[in-house]
Regions:
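Domain-level signal for soluble alpha/beta catalytic cores
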Residues: 1-403
Length: 403
């Protein structure tokens, strides 16, 4: 991946607003044989070309396909690309593998969670696959998802299409391309294993499946962004855990992630994690200082971590004590997905400089906290946020390089 010696490079963390006609095709094309699905695949290359051009216009240096091929939640697309899972009847004798999302917060703010507001974006229209404000999702209790047979990746043609569309859209343009791909924890850690002899064997199989997708991306000369929010959100699923319990688990998690990354070029790998993109209090998020050293054991060249919202913006101080290894880079989020307020470019610049002064200006690139296409209320606000990030990066570059 590109390392700049004269300015701060700009990227973002994932999904971007999709054209309305593409959303309609996705919503109508759930059947594999539908006419809408065929039309969707014909429309997709032009849509990706358009969003790449839009990113370039807004000053983004490391661009993606907007995650246009990934309808709904950030990880749902893998249900079509990985087999080995099935819906099975719930077994009253089998305890839930873990608590629900944000259980620590949920216990302190039960009324807020009952409202369902945290499922929504911060306002405005909601992309297909996301709940509308105030709607409470009802989760069936009579069945559950489980691993019932060997885990295998079957998404080769789908990821090949993702790669082809992005490479065509970036050809001849002075940008790098990246594709986001789900991490093994986020794919499999919350699902019961009914097939393998142990959790370790099961999660290694999940990692093997993920690796097929990662390798396809890196073999194509693109950057793979491993999307692994569960590196930071796992704490919320186990309210009885101590920090020591979490660190023990994350030691195992690092091994799983590195198993998925084995043999792949670190210079094409960026690892992204966050504290979950739900609009919720986040008062019980695990603090970065407790796990930053474990994060750096992941075999990636770059670490993209949520850092722009009001709960975590102060955590650049962690890097006063934790030393970034030689050759590694940080990509702090300096734009928040949690608000429709557009960050001032001066604030963006200040955030960038805070990191650059601690880890070195050549070791910092800039990003959003998470994908903002689905969580910010309107696409006009998304474009304004990306423009503010680019302007802030330019201001920071002048301060850091003196020109």
């Amino acid at each position: 991946m590109r390392r700049s010696s004269d300015r701060i490079l700009v990227s973002h963390a994932g999904n971007l607003p999709r054209p309305a006609d593409l959303d309609e095709l996705i919503d109508g094309g759930r059947s594999r044989e539908s006419a809408e699905r065929k039309e969707y695949h014909e429309r997709l290359p032009r849509a990706v070309s358009g969003i790449v051009d839009r990113q370039i216009e807004l000053g983004v240096d490391i661009v993606n396909d907007g995650e246009y091929a990934k309808a709904g939640s950030y990880g749902g697309y893998m249900q079509e690309r990985v087999v080995g899972y099935a819906t099975v009847p719930a077994d009253p004798s089998r305890k839930p593998k873990r608590a629900g999302t944000a259980e620590r917060d949920r216990r302190e703010f039960p009324g807020f969670y009952a409202s369902g507001l945290w499922f929504s974006g911060s306002g405005g229209p909601i992309r297909p696959g996301f709940a509308t404000p105030g709607e409470v999702r009802q989760i069936a209790t009579r069945d559950t998802r489980a691993c019932t047979e060997p885990i295998r990746y079957i998404g080769q043609s789908a990821v090949a299409e993702d790669i082809a569309n992005l490479k065509a859209a970036t050809r001849g343009k002075d940008v790098e391309g990246y594709i986001a791909a789900l991490g093994p924890l986020s794919l499999g850690a919350g699902i019961h294993n009914l097939h393998y002899n142990s959790e370790e064997e099961y999660m290694q199989a999940v990692a093997d499946a993920c690796r097929v997708e990662y390798k396809a991306v890196t073999d194509a000369g693109l950057i793979v962004q491993v999307d692994e929010p569960e590196f930071l959100t796992t704490w919320s699923f186990y309210p009885e855990w101590t920090v020591e319990d979490l660190r023990k688990y994350l030691g195992f998690a690092v091994d799983v992630i590195n198993h998925a990354l084995r043999g792949l070029p670190q210079e094409q790998i960026r690892f992204h994690s966050c504290w979950g993109s739900g609009h919720r209090p986040h008062v019980h998020d695990i603090e970065l200082k407790y796990i930053a050293d474990l994060l750096l054991k992941i075999n990636a060249q770059q670490y993209a971590i949520e850092a722009g919202n009001v709960r975590h913006a102060h955590e650049y101080h962690v890097w006063e004590e934790v030393k970034l290894p030689a050759g590694k880079m940080l990509m702090p989020g300096v734009i928040s997905h949690a608000t429709d307020l557009v960050e001032h470019p001066e604030l963006v610049a200040e955030r960038i400089v805070n990191y650059a002064r601690l880890v070195g200006r050549e070791n910092v690139q800039t990003s959003t906290d998470c994908g903002i296409g689905s969580r910010v209320g309107h696409e006009e606000v998304v474009w304004a946020k990306l423009a503010a990030m680019s302007e802030g990066a330019a201001i920071a570059s002048r301060r850091l390089w003196g020109r």
